[in-house]
């Protein structure tokens, strides 16, 4: 059996096995909020779709963009790591260090904490018999 044939048979089988394991072992807690439409991180009440919007969502989007660009800038080094040598490795480590320090600073300032204006009170019995109660 060649490597390509083995690869073409192994990957779908592995994907099906992992999906089956996820389906079997994942928690199932159905409640009404899971079936409702998701609108910008909060629920609209009585048609109030134009309420104030938390800036935290934009901070998350900017962080995603920054770390996505970080991966994009690291990719050329990974492709040519052998020719770059130790100098390129040091530059990449400094690049990662600056990104990590910035992320740690944001975590320290609680910039990634999203404050919700809603109070959840679910007292719902799921099909498995577990009670879901969450008061904020």
Curated annotation (Swiss-Prot):
Gene Ontology molecular functions? NADH dehydrogenase (ubiquinone) activity
- Its main localization is mitochondrion
Under the heading Gene3D superfamilies, the entry gives: NADH:ubiquinone/plastoquinone oxidoreductase, chain 3 (1.20.58.1610)
Looking at the keywords, is Transferase present? no
Keywords for this protein? Electron transport, Membrane, Mitochondrion, NAD, Respiratory chain, Translocase, Transmembrane, Transmembrane helix, Transport, Ubiquinone
What are the transmembrane regions?
5-25, 55-75, 85-105
UniProt catalytic activity = a ubiquinone + NADH + 5 H(+)(in) = a ubiquinol + NAD(+) + 4 H(+)(out)
Topology in membrane: Multi-pass membrane protein
The family database entries (Pfam families) matched by this protein are listed as: Oxidored_q4
What is the main EC category here? translocase
Signal peptide stretch: none
Q: Which family does it belong to?
A: Belongs to the complex I subunit 3 family.
- Name it: NADH-ubiquinone oxidoreductase chain 3
